[in-house]
Amino acid sequence: HVKKILNASYKDIPDNFKILTESEVSQVNNSHLQSPILPKQEPGTKPSNALAYELYVDGEINPSRKAIVLNLEASNKKFGDKALGAPFLIYAPGAFKNPTTNAFETASNWSFAVKPGDKLGYEWPLDAFEGGLYHLQVYGPNGYYREFKGNKNDPQLSLVSSYTADGGDNKTGIYKLDIENLSNTMLSIKVTDNAYQHGKKTIDLKPGEKKPVRVPTVKSQGWYDFTLIADGNDAFSRRYCGRLELGKDSISDPLMGGEMSINLS
């Protein structure tokens, strides 16, 4: 082993790589899924076991409008004693102020674990984000993902997630997002499917009005990916991705398998 290590120091420097041009780098950054340069995921899907996850992450500005609060939940309402807890990894991909050094850093992160039937909350002060613009990405198991963007001027909305079976064979479900206008002005909300060809919806809410948005997942066998924005507030957005778990086996993500095309325009 020592001889192999010593001999390795005399080997040629690897040269079996391609140096990318500026235009190729730009192409990859703009549309990595369509890039002919990057390695490709093998196309197609495979059977995927049911998992006893019933996870919810919702976020809102606190009453003083000085912090963004995320509530993490691993519910046991659907699976009872078989329900699973979950790890959550949360990133601030932009500049976030280190409380020890008081300097801005990128890719700050926090790890959480929530046991079955439990929930927890955590808050981040807005002044710790550069320019007061918060941006948090939440990663959970099996493709679970949430993204929160905004600032102190977020619209006064209540967003509560849930899901149910679609009435078929219980393999797929309907993601339900209850949207309530807590302000004293009219709000117009747009919900856009990013991957699974469900198009766009516009929801107009009078002051105090509450309406549900239902996102079907039958085309994608439980997988979903959609973004919510509010007219007149370019900083605010919420993104919801993952797979609805209903106790039945499904398939791996058809977007990852190249059977759907992503659209984030």
PLM regions: where:
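Membrane-interface soluble catalytic domains
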Residues: 1-265
